Design a protein with these regions (language model features):
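A composition/biophysics-driven feature that prefers long, compositionally simple stretches
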Residues: 1-255
């Protein structure tokens, strides 16, 4: 957290020693999470800021639920929350790019269900919830739904991507360089439309009026949430993909 005259880093006990060493002399204060004397970030902001001031954060890094809770608490002191900009962009010159590692298919022989079958299951769940479509932002849910795996996150076989599922169209938003010709052909045969990773917000902003959009508020970042037109109805709940992937089919059970 950076204010006009203070800066602080909040971290847990795994990094207390490392953070203390690396922050020494930097002017950045270490706040040790889970200790009784440590204020939360929200408490710090409420103490340091005044009515009429604003807090900026990158809406791609906060869930819709987290942003809503923070905005509500800040509003008690008439402090605004602005999630529209990444304030670090342009300052962090050597910032790593979004990973472009190639993805690979989780074959049906191991997953026990095709992509098309999984999309049908999700759409059935959406109908029962009274929703027309679903935003997928949790990487594990996307990997399960589209039978894909990757190496974007160390020790986790997930793929940096977004997805949108509806009866009419299922879209995987992913960097093109991650796709081989074989997996591109496979996904298209399964009824999946491929789109550039960065196009997700523009796509959501053009959803038809009166669409009923299912959103898992804890797993969808606030930038995606804010891109949904005001004419749409938000259906909140736990993602259908999260429920479905927890129910193991016979092939998956045999694989344990």
């Amino acid at each position: 957290v950076v204010t006009a005259d203070k800066a602080g880093l909040w971290t847990d006990s795994r990094y207390f020693l490392q953070a203390a060493s690396q922050l020494e002399g930097s002017g950045i204060e270490l706040y040790k999470l889970a200790l009784p004397e440590t204020p939360s970030i929200t408490e710090f902001l409420l103490h340091e800021l005044h009515a009429g001031q604003a807090v900026g954060l990158d809406g791609q890094t906060y869930s819709a639920a987290e942003a809503s809770a923070l905005a509500n608490k800040l509003s008690r002191k008439e402090i605004k929350l602005d999630t529209s900009a990444d304030l670090i962009e342009g300052i962090w010159k050597d910032r790593p790019a979004v990973p472009g590692n190639p993805i690979f298919e989780m074959p049906e022989a191991l997953s026990g269900a095709s992509v098309h079958e999984k999309l049908d299951l999700i759409n059935n769940q959406l109908r029962s919830e009274g929703a027309d479509c679903l935003i997928l932002a949790a990487l594990d849910e996307i990997a399960w739904t589209f039978n894909i795996r990757g190496t974007d996150v160390t020790y986790n076989p997930v793929v940096v991507s977004y997805a949108f599922v509806s009866e009419d169209e299922s879209v995987l938003f992913i960097k093109p360089e991650k796709l081989t010709a074989e997996i591109t052909e496979h996904l298209k045969k399964e009824g999946v439309t491929l789109a550039e990773y960065s196009m997700i917000q523009r796509y959501l902003s053009r959803l038809p009026e009166n669409s009923r959009v299912f959103v898992d508020m804890n797993k969808t970042n606030v930038s995606l949430y804010d891109a949904i037109p005001g004419s749409c109805t938000i259906v909140e709940g736990i993602s259908p993909a999260n429920h479905l992937k927890s129910i193991k089919n016979e092939t998956e059970i045999k694989g344990f």
